[in-house]
Amino acid sequence: MASDELPVAAAATEEEDLVEILDEGSGRLDIARYVDHVRDLAAGAIATFEGTTRDSFEGRRVVELRYEAYGAMARRRLAAILREARAAHSLRRLAVAHRLGTVPAGEASVFVAASAVHRADAMEACRYVIDEVKASVPIWKKEVYDDGEVWKENREFLDRTTTDGTTASSPAPATRPAKGGGCCGSKVRANES
C-alpha cells in the first residue's frame, strides 16, 4: 500500500451489531449513539428509521403507547433479524433499539440504523429490519387514547403465513382479518358481549 492510501476498515461482524431493548423508565432512545454506532469510514450511506408515537389514530387523540415484550425471546429475534439483513445485503454496521413501557406522543419507540458502502443496501436493510421487527418480534403495543385504550394488531403482517404453511416474502395488504384470524388464528378466543 502506498503511504498516502488509507487502509480499508473491516466491516463489523454480527457480534458487533447493536441490539437494545430499553426497559420502562430507561428514558428516550439515544438516536445519536445508534447512528454513531453504525458510522464507518468505508460506508457511503447510513439509512435510519425512527418509529414515533403519533398523536391521533382514526380521529381519536392518542396520549401514549405502552409496550410489553417477552424480553429474552425479543432480544434473540432482533439479533436474528440483523443476521438475516447481513445475509441479504452488503452492510457495514447495524443497530436496532426498542423501548418498552410508556412512550408519549411525539417520542420514538423504535429505531433502526444501517450503514453500507452503497445507499441501496443500507436503505433496503433498514426497511427489512423494521418490517421484520413489526412482524415477528414478541413486542406488544397498547394504544392509549384520551377516551380509552386498545391492544393493537399489526394488520399488515397478520396474514403472512400462506395456506400451505409457508411464510410469504412480503407483507400482506393492510386489510382487516377475518374473525378468529390473525397471527394466532383459532388459538385465541375473544369473548364478545
UniProtKB/Swiss-Prot annotation:
Stretches for region Disordered: 159-193
Biased composition (Low complexity): 163-178
EC class of the enzyme, as a word: transferase
Pfam short name (any one): MoaE
InterPro entries xref list: MoaE_sf, MOCS2B_euk, Mopterin_biosynth_MoaE
Coiled-coil ranges per UniProt: none
KW Iron-sulfur (keyword) present: no
Described function: Catalytic subunit of the molybdopterin synthase complex, a complex that catalyzes the conversion of precursor Z into molybdopterin. Acts by mediating the incorporation of 2 sulfur atoms from thiocarboxylated MOCS2A into precursor Z to generate a dithiolene group.
HAMAP family, alphabetized: MOC2B (MF_03052)
Name of the protein this chain belongs to: Molybdopterin synthase catalytic subunit
Native source species: Oryza sativa subsp. indica (Rice)
Gene name of the encoded protein: MOCS2
